[in-house]
From Swiss-Prot:
Name the UniProt record assigns to this protein: Mitochondrial inner membrane protein Mpv17
Lineage: Eukaryota, Metazoa, Chordata, Craniata, Vertebrata
Disease field: Mitochondrial DNA depletion syndrome 6: A disease due to mitochondrial dysfunction. It is characterized by infantile onset of progressive liver failure, often leading to death in the first year of life, peripheral neuropathy, corneal scarring, acral ulceration and osteomyelitis leading to autoamputation, cerebral leukoencephalopathy, failure to thrive, and recurrent metabolic acidosis with intercurrent infections. Charcot-Marie-Tooth disease, axonal, type 2EE: A recessive axonal form of Charcot-Marie-Tooth disease, a disorder of the peripheral nervous system, characterized by progressive weakness and atrophy, initially of the peroneal muscles and later of the distal muscles of the arms. Charcot-Marie-Tooth disease is classified in two main groups on the basis of electrophysiologic properties and histopathology: primary peripheral demyelinating neuropathies (designated CMT1 when they are dominantly inherited) and primary peripheral axonal neuropathies (CMT2).
Alphabetized UniProt keyword annotations: Charcot-Marie-Tooth disease, Disease variant, Membrane, Mitochondrion, Mitochondrion inner membrane, Neurodegeneration, Neuropathy, Primary mitochondrial disease, Transmembrane, Transmembrane helix
Membrane topology per record: Multi-pass membrane protein
Length: 176
């Protein structure tokens, strides 16, 4: 519990920094899980650069974009009623999620050195499956998140659930 209290104090003092660092850390953890448990690479074959790429994406893209999106969404649809949460989830999953995945997957491809043509082909191959898989997990998570969780904790809650999602995304994004 002391760790949780320290996190809350840090979040209160430096909300943006803590949210971004949380996203980066949990993106990295998702990649480690992907490489070790899904792909079964072992420590000798672990691609540290790939993990650092995912941490960087978490800090430089996922944290700021998702954290910013939650702020915009809360301004656009203020309130925490069940109806408000449903509206937020529908906007999130109907508008934001498809765009986010459409940016995330090619960004990883570009960071991994794929040519524009290869990146486009990979996006065409992987995007539909990633989006469909997204819809198995995220609508229920986001509905609960928007209804039960205060704004300043939403990114952290989502990123905790997203450790598993990040493992999937890392595997999907790095699969050739």
């Amino acid at each position: 519990m002391a760790l949780w209290r320290a996190y809350q104090r840090a979040l209160a003092a430096h909300p943006w920094k803590v949210q971004v660092l949380t996203a980066g850390s949990l993106m990295g953890l998702g990649d480690i899980i992907s490489q070790q448990l899904v792909e079964r690479r072992g420590l000798q074959e672990h691609q540290r650069g790939r993990t650092l790429t995912m941490v960087s994406l978490g800090c430089g893209f996922v944290g700021p974009v998702v954290g910013g999106w939650y702020k915009v969404l809360d301004r656009f649809i203020p309130g925490t009623t069940k109806v408000d949460a449903l509206k937020k989830m529908l906007l999130d999953q109907g508008g934001f999620a498809p765009c986010f995945l459409g940016c995330f997957l090619p960004l990883v491809g570009a960071l991994n050195g794929l040519s524009a043509q290869d990146n486009w082909a990979k996006l065409q191959r992987d995007y539909p499956d990633a989006l469909i898989t997204n819809y198995y997990l995220w609508p229920a998570v986001q509905l609960a998140n928007f209804y039960l969780v205060p704004l300043h904790y939403r990114l952290a809650v989502v990123q905790c659930v997203a450790v598993i999602w990040n493992s999937y995304l890392s595997w999907k994004a790095h699969r050739l």
